[in-house]
Amino acid sequence: MAHGGEAGPARLVVLVSGTGTNLQALLDASAEPAFGALVAAVGADRAGIEGLARAERAGIPTFTRRLADYPDRAGWDRALTDAVSSYRPDLVVSAGFMKLVGPAFLAAFGGRFINTHPALLPAFPGVHGVRDALDYGVKVTGCTVFMVDAGTDTGPVIAQAVVPVREDDDVAGLHERIKVAERALLVDTVRAMASGGWSVQGRKVKVGR
């Protein structure tokens, strides 16, 4: 399965649930033509969040699909899929999107839907990755960009960055340093995928030709 590398900037749809700091990193990067990608739209699962406000200030189209507005999760998943599809993305980026997508979304965007995680997967998956790494006593942790699949933080790894753990670290301090690394890693990974394309073979993701 190969994607990308065509002429013209890659089209991104970015999904958010909160403040949108990873989105802002992508918006800032996309202001440079050499980045090779543009944010075509920003979607959210709730209204009134800073992530949507960031997009609106940048003149980016936005949409909201709230789970509570649909009779079941499958209906929400189809609606989210249709909304994202309407912007013809080359790559879909979860930038702090806190909902698990379903079969319709993965069928449409499998192999081109990426997410970040604040640990070195497959170690410490789930919502408490930073705390779990600190509690375990590891000397290094970090962040991962990965392809989303039907599991929780189980998709193929695309890129990782290491963050040392300090003796005096607490969860909040360590998480802040991981977030800095995560933003840089996400921007670098999207840039590489947009410019060089990517392919997925089983659990192996190759970026560039």
Model-derived segments and their meaning:
Residues 2-50, 54:
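N-terminal Rossmann-like dinucleotide-binding module
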Residues 29, 95-204, 208:
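Donor/substrate-binding cores of folate-linked one-carbon enzymes
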Residues 35-79:
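Short, surface-exposed acidic-centric catalytic microdomains
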Residues 40, 90, 111:
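Conserved acidic residues
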Residues 44-45, 68-69, 73, 87-103:
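N-terminal glycine-rich "phosphate-gripper" loop used for MgATP/nucleotide binding
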Residues 61, 90, 139:
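Residue-level detector of anion-binding/catalytic polar loops
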Residues 78-87:
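Short, well-structured alpha-helical segments in soluble
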